[in-house]
Amino acid sequence: MSSLDKTMHFDFNQNKGKNIRDTLEDVYKALEEKGYSPINQIVGYLLSGDPAYIPRHNDARNLILKHERDEIIEELVKSYLGKDK
């Protein structure tokens, strides 16, 4: 079986959940303060990977760039499904 036939396994550090949650809350607040639609801007960033969707205001861009987008998406899915406990 070639390596292309194998399923990849993601295993993220369990302690990052709170940090990602805190980061998203801080980014959300910064976007609100700047008058943007926070959900639209965060989704735009997550889909495109373009940090220009996140302002530098209150260091929001640097904060969100500390996390991989796939880790953020994983936390969002776990939270949505109630599996974040």
UniProtKB/Swiss-Prot annotation:
InterPro entries documented for this protein: IreB (IPR009309)
Pfam family, one: IreB
Family: Belongs to the UPF0297 family.
Alphabetical list of PANTHER family matching this protein: UPF0297 PROTEIN YRZL
NCBIfam families: PRK05473.1
Annotated protein name in UniProt: UPF0297 protein Ldb1606
Organism whose genome encodes this protein: Lactobacillus delbrueckii subsp. bulgaricus (strain ATCC 11842 / DSM 20081 / BCRC 10696 / JCM 1002 / NBRC 13953 / NCIMB 11778 / NCTC 12712 / WDCM 00102 / Lb 14)
